[in-house]
Amino acid sequence: GKSTFLEAFGMLLIREGLKVAVIAVDPSSPVTGGSILGDKTRMNDLARAEAAFIRPVPSSGHLGGASQRAGELMLLCEAAGYDVVIVETVGVGQSETEVARMVDCFISLQIAGGGDDLQGIKKGLMEVADLLVINKDDGDNHTNVAIARHMYESALHILRRKYDEWQPRVLTCSALEKRGIDEIWHAIIDFKTALTASGRLQQVRQQQSVEWLRKQTEEEVLNHLFANEDFDRYYRQTLLAVKNNTLSPRTGLRQLSEFIQTQYFD
């Protein structure tokens, strides 16, 4: 459903005269670390469009669905002149707040029936979503979509708003039949207009830069730490001790912390 929606949405933007970049974060295998990288092949028309750029990126095991380099790739796409940059997440419904901190507008794409509508509510996606879109409003699914829409709208009324300037909207569409796609784009424009007028969008962008620096700093510190042979060896010994139940995880953490303190700060 995601790829069909993205292609319909991307082609609409191109017809509006915009250049579109899609960063399709692909699920990585927890066993081999490899990724499927098949999203591009499922968006044939968009992949062939001159005004579109699609880049599959492995998620590298990040629960939030965002690759470590997805943020940098977004900036590169903006610098290259793409008007709209779309980040497609793994869609596992876990820790998607990581993605919400990377983008200006976060859209949660749902389908009615099968428990997905309830999942969206339970997993807290509504708290970070700026727009909720229920896809597959076609065929015999109209009743399910109407019920799901009512559930989401009712839930949104009791949740605290993410922004004072914006009340999240629930929209429906059929990517297969190309219906409702333009309403989604108009809602995104309304969202951007509201946040720009209040100055909130600038604050969001500033926070994105701060968040990027924080994440990259953590990554660099860990890289330097594990590049130290003494720490790497001590860390592996600690892991083995915890695995063999000769050391509790809490004690292991304390000992690692003391080792770092001795090596780098004393």
What are these regions (language model features)?
Residues 10-14, 41, 71, 75-78, ...:
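Signal for well-folded cores of large energy- and translation-related assemblies
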Residues 26, 70, 88, 125, ...:
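Residue-level signature of catalytic and energy-coupling elements of molecular machines
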Residues 4-95, 102-108, 114-117:
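Nucleotide-state-sensitive switch-loop elements of NTP-binding domains
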